[in-house]
Amino acid sequence: MAGTDSPAAARFVYRCLLFAPAIVVGLLLPLTLPPIAAAQRHTASDNPSTYNIGGVLSNSESETYFHTIISHLNFDQQYVPRKVTYYDKTIRMDKNPIKTVFNVCDKLIENRVYAVVVSHEQTSGDLSPAAVSYTSGFYSIPVIGISSRDAAFSDKNIHVSFLRTVPPYYHQADVWLEMLSHFAYTKVIIIHSSDTDGRAILGRFQTTSQTYYDDVDVRATVELIVEFEPKLESFTEHLIDMKTAQSRVYLMYASTEDAQVIFRDAGEYNMTGEGHVWIVTEQALFANNTPDGVLGLQLEHAHSDKGHIRDSVYVLASAIKEMISNETIAEAPKDCGDSAVNWESGKRLFQYLKSRNITGETGQVAFDDNGDRIYAGYDVINIREHQKKHVVGKFSYDSMRAKMRMNINDSEIIWPGKQNRKPEGIMIPTHLKVLTIEEKPFVYVRRMGDDEFRCEPDERPCPLFNATDSTANEYCCRGYCIDLLIELSKRINFTYDLALSPDGQFGHYLLRNNTGAMTLRKEWTGLMGELVNERADMIVAPLTINPERAEYIEFSKPFKYQGITILEKKPSRSSTLVSFLQPFSNTLWILVMVSVHVVALVLYLLDRFSPFGRFKLSHSDSNEEKALNLSSAVWFAWGVLLNSGIGEGTPRSFSARVLGMVWAGFAMIIVASYTANLAAFLVLERPKTKLSGINDARLRNTMENLTCATVKGSSVDMYFRRQVELSNMYRTMEANNYATAEQAIQDVKKGKLMAFIWDSSRLEYEASKDCELVTAGELFGRSGYGVGLQKGSPWTDSVTLAILEFHESGFMEKLDKQWIFHGHVQQNCELFEKTPNTLGLKNMAGVFILVGVGIAGGVGLIIIEVIYKKHQVKKQKRLDIARHAADKWRGTIEKRKTIRASLAMQRQYNVGLNSTHPPGTISLAVDKRRYPRLGQRLGPERAWPGDAADVLRTRRPYELGKPGQSPKVMVATPAMLGRTRPQQNILPPRYSPGYTSDVSHLVV
């Protein structure tokens, strides 16, 4: 088998070595080797005192140096503990991998090597190093390569214990990213072979770029990936696709032979001349036809075997020293034929090796998880005339920052076409597709009539393309942004086709489920979607610059600085029925009312108890004014307050008059203050806004009667999503959001929407145009409007510089005055604000109603007085009738008494003269009260008021006689008198001494 040198046999052996050991390792090792366990407690005496280090080297010189380094290592106490000695065991690398395997078993493993250092000549291929890795890895013996750079050695499923002090070829992708960031290139084309290393470098570039660009401002994107089969014969087909791409920066990984074919064909297509940039890997740099101006990379110390041998030995010694101090090291395996060997210490040693980080002869030596060298330095090579290689930069380790750093001297670079100036790296198109959107006053859109064939001079055609049937509706656009676009095209020299946003939206980020897709995918809609998907080159519209959009597109410097504000309708003047009461608060009105009556009461008391008041003056003239009563005092207090004339009822005492003067002064101040404030409230006052700004409590804690909204998917909508403190407000307003700003503004005018939150430029324009609208509070969320371009667009810097020049020249200020701030309209609004209101019925209706209430109150009171007076008159009339009846009855009684007295006198006279009647007889008219039973027998009499309820006085009708006649007198005999009842049951009659003249009880 030693004579198997043909390429076919070598490839066969390589495949066998590639797959067979992998299968064996994959199937047997999980069954025979337990997982790595933690080291147990040990002592220094448990570890071996001698360690054999194997070497599979490419030449005798390397073997000699390896022996020397091991000898010197034993005297370095920094790396070698006491009582520990290292010995070297070396063999020569054979081109035959099978022979190499046997040599490793017989000459290295049989001598208990703890690790193997392997190198080979670059021209011999990687079959022999792979054989060493397979064999040693099977027994968990670490292998340190110093020259193998293929990507296959990074696969730890196959090369389980392989490390290397050189980086793999595909690590050059890291240097590519640094170079692109340095030159600020944003679009690239990657050319790579379809082998393992070619695909590895592409994957490394794509993976690393995702995290690399988080720390830098300029992001490079891959516009085109060109993959070719090795052993090229022609590259023309791929060059055609590359020529139509926009990028002119080519990153190439290819072997030296393939690079020659690519450079040959690219030169024929004039793609290696001025304006093109080629950045290639180490192998391509050695092509014999590399064009002038090509940039390439070359690994530092790539061919310094001695340096790598020394670094690998010291890395190994450092790992063994730390392992000795931490755990017990078992002896290395000795029998290559024993497949059951499980050297756990070898696996642990491999982990210690990967964690090393030392400063070696080839630079900073450290490893990643795959055992590949990191912190490797590169030279940046510039190909000059006659294939001369000139170092123009270095990619080296910065010990202060503990990271790699790129340093390139741009002035020393000669670019393709022998140019000293860095190419743009991109083909700059001069005819652009520009999109805009209707948004007053920045863009006014007018549909063309059927008979119109062109727009007005200040307008530009802006068709609206239908996404479903690709038809276009013809429109004309003008406004702030259209004038800006016209001036930009003149200044930086490009032509354009203008069109409207297909869906009429600025665009927002949506999760969409594409047909047949299993997962959701985020996509931009509207203007943003057109630009991100490269269906447009530029957006000239009031497009707010925010982080969400800046992640996917480029923005120029702002052409208009603005913020977010709130638009609301001005509250109408409150012309209520009690408008005249507005100058004073309710509390003050109550105090004034109370003061009037308190002062009136005090005036009355002062005048009542003063010794100089009319109540105390006994000799006062009867012609003088009457004393001040309480009613007059109240009248006086009200009269002074209302400034009416006081004709009567003024206080007389000095103390009361002093109080009256003070009250008059108080009334003067109150009336003057009321008059002044009434004018301010009814004439000069302008209503304020309902909201104080975004921090208004009514917005933060939205009530049912307060509605606020913005445009869904807009930059304002994104702003509210970002602000945590506005989350409650956003959840409330999200359901009210509108599709367009125009709809929301119309609803504000109609009163359907209380607050519309939008860009300040648009809302200030609306407020200046309509005096009924006003912006509330200060600006918040300050940002700006910018021109949107594709990521990496070559026009970004030119547009930015042009906009800055426009600001300096005053052109932007001119656009502001022309389109946003309508001076005459705003002046009219200010004049309207300052003009006093003419008082109308609405303003003073309350006063008239107050007068009406007074009149109605007076009428009501007079009706009550009339009714009361009628009642009093009726009562008085009844009293008069009763009094008249009583007087008449009294007269009758007196008359009867007189008659009876005269009759008694006559009877006495007759008795005395004639003695006709027997003694003891009296007139019943006189003694009837003493003999009621006699009266009862004589017949019933009338009942008189004043008699007891149970006693009836009887009076015989004939007793009174006829009118004009004297009553008849009945003479009672002693027998009749003897049948009388006891005296106690008799009540006195009206004419008895108990009689009273009060007749009020007679009134019914």
Curated annotation (Swiss-Prot):
Keywords: Calcium, Cell membrane, Disulfide bond, Glycoprotein, Ion channel, Ion transport, Ligand-gated ion channel, Magnesium, Membrane, Phosphoprotein, Postsynaptic cell membrane, Receptor, Signal, Synapse, Transmembrane, Transmembrane helix, Transport. It is a multi-pass membrane protein. GO terms for molecular function: glutamate-gated receptor activity. Its main location: membrane. GO terms for biological process: calcium ion homeostasis; chemical synaptic transmission; ionotropic glutamate receptor signaling pathway; long-term memory; olfactory learning; regulation of membrane potential. Residues 994-1004 have a biased composition (Polar residues). Residues 607-663, 865-1004 are cytoplasmic. The keyword Calcium applies. Residues 40-585, 685-843 are extracellular. Residues 980-1004 are annotated as: Disordered. Residues 1-39 form the signal peptide. It holds the Pfam family Lig_chan-Glu_bd. Glycine binds at residues 542-544, 549, 715, 759. The keyword Transmembrane helix applies. The chain crosses the membrane at residues 586-606, 664-684, 844-864. GO terms for cellular component: NMDA selective glutamate receptor complex; postsynaptic density; postsynaptic membrane. It is found in: Cell membrane; Postsynaptic cell membrane; Postsynaptic density. Glycans are attached at residues 270, 326, 357, 409, 466, 493, 513, 705. NMDA receptor subtype of glutamate-gated ion channels with high calcium permeability and voltage-dependent sensitivity to magnesium. Mediated by glycine. This protein plays a key role in synaptic plasticity, synaptogenesis, excitotoxicity, memory acquisition and learning. It mediates neuronal functions in glutamate neurotransmission. Is involved in the cell surface targeting of NMDA receptors. Plays a role in associative learning and in long-term memory consolidation. Forms a heteromeric NMDA channel with Nmdar2. Belongs to the glutamate-gated ion channel (TC 1.A.10.1) family. This is Glutamate [NMDA] receptor subunit 1. It comes from Drosophila pseudoobscura pseudoobscura. The lineage of its organism: Eukaryota, Metazoa, Ecdysozoa, Arthropoda, Hexapoda.
